[in-house]
Every structure is written in C-alpha cells, then in structure tokens.
C-alpha cells in the first residue's frame, strides 16, 4: 500500500472517502462485467470447438471426394468447372454489443444462379461427372458454417482482449487504488484525531 501525497485535512478526507466509494462501486461493476464476459467467452469457445470439428471433418471428406472426382476429369475441364461460381453471396456485417465489446454479426444471402429448374448445377457448356457436381455442391453447403465459424472466432478474440483489459483494471483497483485510498484515509483520520487531542490539551492548559 502507498499513502497518497495529500494534506491531512477534513475536506481532503471527505474527497478521499467519495473516491473510495466510487472505486469500490467501479470494482464491483468491472468484476461483474469480467464474469459475464468469461461466461459468454466460454460458451463461444465451446460452440467454436464443436463447429470447427464439424467443418474440418466435412472438409476432409469433401476433399477426398474431390480428389476422386478430379481423377475422372482433365485438368482443363476442372479449371473450366471452377471458372463458374456455383453460389453468389451477399454478405452484410453488423456488430452486436456484448458487455461493451462490439462483436461481428454476419448476415449472408446465398443465391444459386447457376442451377436449372430442378436445382441441378449447370456449368455453361462444361459437362462434368456427377461425382464432381455432388462434391462441389457439398462444399458450397459448408459456406454458412464457415461464415459462422469466422464470426465466432473473431468474437472470441475480441472478448479475450476485453477480458484481459478488464482483469487488469479490476486488479489495479483491488490491489492498488482501493488499498492506497484506505491507507490514506486511515492516515488522515489519525492525524485529525491527533490534532483534536492536541487542541483539547491546549484548551485544558489554558483553563
């Protein structure tokens, strides 16, 4: 604890008591914020881990299917197939306020412009094998999960940064500001009591 460099006056004592009251209230609010952020962070990390496992597992399967489908086509044919996007995505990114942390919220509108009336993918004049069609369609279906994964991971990063900042502020109040204020208040109260006793002794001597 470090005593503040202030004059031991009653006015200063009242000011320090007001500051202490504010610091204690701020400490509680920051602890509540930290605890709620931790709760949200843990929930998001849990969802992130589950979704990442799902996406990675799906990607491994789709890539294996793609390798097999690609073996049935020439390199030129594969280039032609991927020259035509099967999905068009309009992405709108907003932010959501979570305990003063602005986290991203993605809204995606996904169109399938290159499908026929029955929903089958078409590639202009390119004719691919059915296995390639199914693989490309399956990969395209992963897009919503990939966007959600990006959203969650960015949110986790932002919340982790804010949790660390809040933790430092809580510790600063708990282990420095509040103890220093209490120590200084105690010092001033002792000084004022000493002054009162000295004044009382002088008055008694005068009498």
Swiss-Prot record:
Q: Which UniProt keywords apply?
A: ATP synthesis, Hydrogen ion transport, Ion transport, Transport
- Listed GO molecular functions? ATP binding; proton-transporting ATP synthase activity, rotational mechanism; proton-transporting ATPase activity, rotational mechanism
* UniProt superkingdom: Bacteria
Against Gene3D superfamilies, the record matches this protein to: 1.10.287.3240
**One GO term of the biological process aspect:** proton motive force-driven plasma membrane ATP synthesis
**Protein task:** Produces ATP from ADP in the presence of a proton gradient across the membrane.
State the family named in the UniProt similarity comment for this chain.
Answer: Belongs to the V-ATPase D subunit family.
Protein name per its UniProtKB record:
V-type ATP synthase subunit D
- Identify the species of origin: Streptococcus sanguinis (strain SK36)
Instruction: Quote the gene name from the UniProt entry.
Output: atpD
């Amino acid at each position: 604890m470090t005593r503040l460099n202030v004059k031991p006056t009653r006015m200063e004592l009242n000011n320090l008591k007001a500051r202490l009251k504010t610091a204690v209230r701020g400490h509680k609010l920051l602890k509540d914020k930290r605890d709620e952020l931790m709760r949200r962070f843990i929930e998001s990390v849990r969802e992130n881990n589950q979704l990442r496992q799902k996406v990675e597992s799906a990607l491994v399967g789709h890539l294996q299917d793609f390798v097999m489908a690609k073996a049935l086509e020439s390199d030129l044919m594969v280039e032609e197939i991927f020259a035509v996007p099967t999905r068009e995505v309009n992405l709108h990114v907003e932010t959501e306020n979570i305990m003063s942390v602005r986290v991203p919220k993605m809204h995606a509108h996904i169109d399938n412009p290159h499908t026929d009336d029955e929903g089958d993918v078409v590639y202009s004049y390119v004719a691919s094998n059915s296995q390639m069609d199914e693989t490309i369609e399956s990969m395209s279906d992963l897009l919503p999960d990939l966007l959600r994964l990006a959203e969650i991971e960015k949110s986790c990063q932002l919340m982790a940064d804010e949790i660390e900042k809040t933790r430092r502020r809580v510790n600063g109040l708990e282990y420095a500001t509040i103890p220093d204020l209490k120590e200084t208040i105690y010092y001033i109260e002792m000084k004022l009591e000493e002054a009162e006793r000295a004044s009382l002794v002088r008055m008694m001597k005068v009498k």
